[in-house]
Amino acid sequence: MMNRLFGKPKQEANALQTLDKLNETLEMLEKKEKVLLKKAGAEVEKAKEYSRAKNKRAAIQCLKRKRLYEGQVEQLGNFQLRIHDQMIMLEGAKATTETVDALRSGASAMKAMQKATNIDDVDKTMDEINEQTENMKQIQEALATPMGAAADFDEDELAAELDELESEELESQLLQPATTAPPLPSVPVPAGRQPARPVPQKRTAEEEELAALQAEMAL
């Protein structure tokens, strides 16, 4: 009698603690997923920069790291799905336990009133409960099966992805408006080097005589 009185609250407390722990783990996985997605996006931007710098090897390395981050994101998604399944099963099991307890209380009330119990019905109920428990155990074992494998990368596929990034970058550059070339700076004239002055040409004898005649006529 004492076990029935104090055992049930303890089981409910354990179930609530387990649900809280699963919720905390789920939130932690979601935060890690956001961080990995941010890192994957950063690797794509690095790949573009290396591609513009004609550093193809470094760009491919960035794409490899991006693939690794994406693989971890996918794995975290599977973990989150398993936790959701576990929470659903735990809540279902808790509801089942409460339902069974209610049925047992009803059976006790019926026994007090009728002073009789149909053992066949009890056996049938227990068989159904045992069957449900076994099915739930098999589902949990199936979900707990470890998974994961090392990622193999196809160099040709990575090169094709890099070519696609380069094409997108080239297209974005072609769509930008053309800019005018800056004017060339003026070259200062070194000190001491002034432009050459025209040298007066020497007059001929005829030109001197003509000039003298014009001067006399002016007088």
UniProtKB/Swiss-Prot annotation:
Q: Which Pfam families match?
A: Snf7
| Residue numbers spanned by region Disordered | 168-219
InterPro entries noted in UniProt = Snf7_fam (IPR005024)
Q: In its UniProt record, which GO terms are filed under biological process?
A: intralumenal vesicle formation; protein transport; vacuolar transport
| One GO cellular component term noted in the UniProt record for this chain | ESCRT III complex
Q: Which Gene3D superfamilies match?
A: 6.10.250.1710, ESAT-6-like
Top-level taxon of origin: Eukaryota
Report quaternary structure and partners: Component of the endosomal sorting required for transport complex III (ESCRT-III), composed at least of VPS2, VPS20, VPS24 and VPS32. Interacts with SKD1. Interacts with BRO1/ALIX.
Task: Tell me, in a sentence or two, what this protein's role is.
Answer: Component of the ESCRT-III complex, which is required for multivesicular bodies (MVBs) formation and sorting of endosomal cargo proteins into MVBs. The ESCRT-III complex is probably involved in the concentration of MVB cargo.
What is the protein name for this chain?
A: Vacuolar protein sorting-associated protein 32 homolog 2
The protein's organism comes out as Arabidopsis thaliana
